[in-house]
Amino acid sequence: NVQLWSRNALEWTGKIPEIRDAVAALGLTSAALDGELIAGAGTKEDFNLLQATLSGERQGVLTYALFDLLHLDGVDVADAPLLERKALLQSVLEGQGRPLAFSSHVQGDGDEAYRVAGEQHFEGIISKRADRSYHSGRSEDWRKTKQLASDEFAVVGYTAPKGSRTGFGSLLLAKPDPEHGWLYVGRVGSGFNDELM
């Protein structure tokens, strides 16, 4: 009896039967696994494709990238160090392929891992203390470091406000293009409060 839950305590078992069936095929008596659902051809997250796939708008390839094991066949392993839990998880997933994937790790040089993540266009890295027990939610034992990219854009327009928002909905952005004058690059609407508007 496999149940899949989001980090916001939303029950997703019926939305992703291919993941449910793959976890059931592991043949475990009982387990609590922690991971991230990824949509796309590789192992890099495409959040927009994930949302569209879960809503039924698109048919993305889903992968459940597993990075922790908290309970296995009647034994609570959440208090064991992270590296022990990951070794157990890797043994559980041995020989398994998509849609399940073991989320590998790098020990040591965080700066190098961050650089490689940037080269591969990943969102960033998660750094965890290898000797620590599991804690749900954020803690001092792990950090998320995102890749930061910046550029300069011109505001070329805006959309009308919706709901209780006043002023504008979002700002339309463009950058100079030698062939076409201006090239639309997207919109931004977060970060503005009523006082700024």
Q: Where do the protein language model's features map onto the residues?
A:
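Catalytic cores of nucleic-acid ligases and guanylyltransferases
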Residues: 1-197
